Amino acid sequence: MMRDMTKGAPLGHLFLYAVPLLLGNWLQLAYNAVDSIIAGRFIGQDALAAEGVAGPVMNLVILAISGLCIGAGVLMSEAFGAKRTARLKETLATTLLFGAGLCCAAAALGCALTPWILRALAVPDSIFGITGIYLRITFLGAPFTFFYNALAAGLKSVGDSKTPLKFLAFSAVLNAVLDLILIGGLGFGIVCSAVTTVVAEAASALLAAVYVARRVPELCPGHGQWCIRRDLLGPILRYGAVTAVQQAVQPICKVLIQGQVNALGVGAIAAFNAVTRVDDFAFTPEQSIATAITTYIAQNRGAGQTARIRRGFAVGLRLELGYWLLMGSLTLLLRRGILSLFVAGEGAADVIALGSTYLGCMAVFYALPALTNGFQGFYRGMGKMTTTLIGTCIQAGLRAAAAAVLAPRMGLPGIAFACAFGWCVMLAFEVPYYFWTCREWKLPKASPSGLRPQARVEAQPPEAALSAETEAGSGPVR
């Protein structure tokens, strides 16, 4: 169901939009864990190692795909808010056609370069062959992953976050069932695991395509609209490239921090592996709320409803902080019990003690990424992708540097304080720039009056705003 966020109370829009995103992210986290369990238990250590090697490689492909789709999603949200249905359809068509060609080329190139990739990663000879087959099959599934993500971005841009969740749930269940039957029951190997993943991705893409074609005529391109519009492709690529680079920064930072943790010993490594699972469940909802903020602001910016933007952003920040209070309290109260689920046996008490100290600090610090994610959602909705990249680079760089200084002196809690330091400096950059952006765009202050309908102002076409600014999408709606 489409959701027009240019009218009505922001709280209802943001909450109802964010919940399906949150459930989808949790479902993905749970599925990844189940997939690894099935591979490890039914196929063996080599299969689990092959998946582990292929994972980071495919993550780079997924980063590029998601970056392109997020960029297109912001432009589609603007068009939907401005009631420019033709522009909405043309943006989706351009994204699908260009992305399909790009993904097919990337899949072919990836398959051809697989041996060189594995040698560069120093993959052991014992799993070289099986990892190569697994990676090639996974590469072939990239176009299906793109189609689903692009269509899901289109649905989310018109305020429908429930339908993509249904398709994701179907895909996850189908994949798990096929794995259990073909791998657990019939004894097929790791190749079957890769094939079932591709089949599930193809099924979700097909369901999304049929749904858009039959149920969402406002989004489905017509016969004459299936072409690549150069004036739309430029903004999509600029938005998407910056977003993809931004998403790549965090994994690099995690690798650097993992190196500091590794120097602390096996107990610290085990504890950090456990606490990062808790971190994922803390950060994911905050990111879901940020995505809701992005869609809300992009729709209202496209509609020229500037009086609603700051009001909706303020409500979004309250939701972020409300979730932090809930998650922080639960983490403080239950951290030892949660950690005991991940470790057992000899040395478990030491691991739980280390992890508990870390989580005690992070329970308080989770408020900081709640705020930074909220501001990131605001900037994405305003089209300021470069600003989000700068903020992320500041946070990741200082976090890694602080970890190198604090971890040897403080142990695992030093990692927590390094994270807090990076988030604080990120806020020191984002908050002043927020007020500058509000003045630049002449955004009225947040107040209940912002909920009343105002005269609709015709928004600039995305390409017009982009051509006038050095930063993608940084020009105000006139």
Annotated model-derived regions:
Residues 60-63, 107, 175-180, 204-209, ...:
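Hydrophobic transmembrane alpha-helices of multi-pass small-molecule transporters
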Residues 30-49, 118-125, 181-188, 248-277, ...:
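Helix-terminus/linker motif at the lipid-water interface of multi-pass membrane proteins
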Residues 69, 137-156, 164-172, 193-206, ...:
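Short runs within selected transmembrane alpha-helices of multi-pass transporters and secretion channels
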Residues 21, 25, 37, 74, ...:
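Transmembrane alpha-helix boundary and packing residues in multipass membrane permease domains
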Residues 16-35, 137, 148, 171, ...:
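Transmembrane helical elements of multi-pass membrane transporters/channels
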Residues 1-18, 76-141, 185-241, 297-364, ...:
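Short alpha-helical transmembrane segments in multi-pass integral membrane proteins
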Residues 48-108, 145-164, 271-335, 369-383, ...:
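Small-residue-rich hydrophobic transmembrane alpha-helices
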Residues 11-30, 34, 57-64, 140, ...:
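Residue-level signal for short hydrophobic patches within transmembrane helices
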